[in-house]
């Protein structure tokens, strides 16, 4: 997705050779028009897969996931990082390690909203080592739901997340693939 690639190159801030900050349009302030295009693109790629639900994790995955859900005309379900007192009827849970935050969290999804009748498209903002996507896939498996694929907004292709997801048998669609953050510069796949 060319527009997204331009935005990553122009507005992304390289923190170090493994961390890219995109707070200006994705992780803090959200460019709604760009996220609409992201959602539309995921719809075009997965529209024939019988998607019944978009699954993501709070918080940064919600914006692209909700836009995808609008295009699919299905609900968006996000895994919570804390169990609310209102969740009393059972839930699926898994542990997910955040590469950026270097923190492991237990995330949960209510059994009320995910079942074997669902075909989910997992959406996430970033793909580094693949832990978040694999954790969401684990939750879908616990529910006996089918996973149609994984939609990633920005993939750090120099890390092993894509490979890990494919080794798990998952279809991965990354809209922007970053080849390198070396030299304090964003280099996209195909520009090396």
Swiss-Prot record:
Chief subcellular location: cytoplasm
Family indicated by similarity: Belongs to the purine/pyrimidine phosphoribosyltransferase family. Xpt subfamily.
EC number: 2.4.2.22
UniProt cross-references to SUPFAM superfamilies, sorted A to Z: PRTase-like
Positions annotated to bind 5-phospho-alpha-D-ribose 1-diphosphate: 128-132
Gene Ontology molecular function, alphabetical: xanthine phosphoribosyltransferase activity
Keywords for the protein's UniProt record, in alphabetical order: Cytoplasm, Glycosyltransferase, Purine salvage, Transferase
InterPro entries cross-referenced by the UniProt entry: PRibTrfase_dom, PRTase-like, Pur/Pyrimidine_PRTase, Xanthine_PRibTrfase
Protein name as annotated: Xanthine phosphoribosyltransferase
General function of this protein: Converts the preformed base xanthine, a product of nucleic acid breakdown, to xanthosine 5'-monophosphate (XMP), so it can be reused for RNA or DNA synthesis.
Pathway(s) where this gene product acts: Purine metabolism; XMP biosynthesis via salvage pathway; XMP from xanthine: step 1/1
Annotated localization: Cytoplasm
Classification lineage: Bacteria, Bacillati, Bacillota, Bacilli, Bacillales
Record carries keyword Calcium: no
Positions contributing to xanthine binding: 20, 27, 156
Listed GO CC annotations: cytoplasm
Quaternary structure note: Homodimer.
GO biological process, alphabetically ordered: purine ribonucleoside salvage; xanthine metabolic process; XMP salvage
NCBIfam families, per the entry: PRK09219.1, XPRTase
Species whose genome carries this gene: Staphylococcus aureus (strain NCTC 8325 / PS 47)
UniProt catalytic activity: XMP + diphosphate = xanthine + 5-phospho-alpha-D-ribose 1-diphosphate
Superkingdom of origin organism: Bacteria
